[in-house]
Amino acid sequence: MYKRQLEGLQKLEYRGYDSAGIAVLDGSTIELAKACGEIKNLLAKTHDGSDLHGYIGLGHTRWATHGAPTEANAHPHVSNDGKFAIVQNGIIENFMELREMLQAKGFRFHSETDTEVIVHLLDMYYTGDGNLKDTVLKTLGRLEGSYAIGILCADCPEQMFLARNGCPLIIGVGAGENFFASDVTALVSHTKNVVYLDDGELAEVRADGYTVFDCTGKPVH
């Protein structure tokens, strides 16, 4: 699985980036690897990805907006308790307000990015009952700005959630496996069957299918 993630990231190298990272869920543990510079640095750090074990995960290449091009600022970002990992494209306009609120509640930040507020909001709203959709909806309700988000939760190993507002996000539908990306280029070697999310939509993606919801949580298709 990690080979497909890394291959997808390599297909997006043409867009330019300053760091790369990958997170996979191995049982109930999220494994994380990040590196500055080219994807080959991430490959070297993980022995071509063989150090990563799992069957569900996400990856990202970052072009710095908020925060310098450092390993700490590279995506994915992980919650303090290790339950959530996320990647995001876009800009969260109210991130400083959210950051100050979360810090006041005791959440520890390890980066300068606007993205990290999202993973801590997920942690704050999650009740531990496996209801990831409600957690995501509450989190999205606090965000102002544009985003395309991928969310991995250690308590929900059979699903991932996606959310789009103003930035491209695409589901790739395979046979017994599904994918997501911000650019169809990362998907075409695995599937030609793709679904483009609309603004305000979120999606639950599983190996056996997917469900798209509107901003209220009502199924769309």
What is each residue range found by the language model?
Residues 3-221:
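Conserved short alpha-helical segments that host acidic/polar catalytic motifs at enzyme active sites
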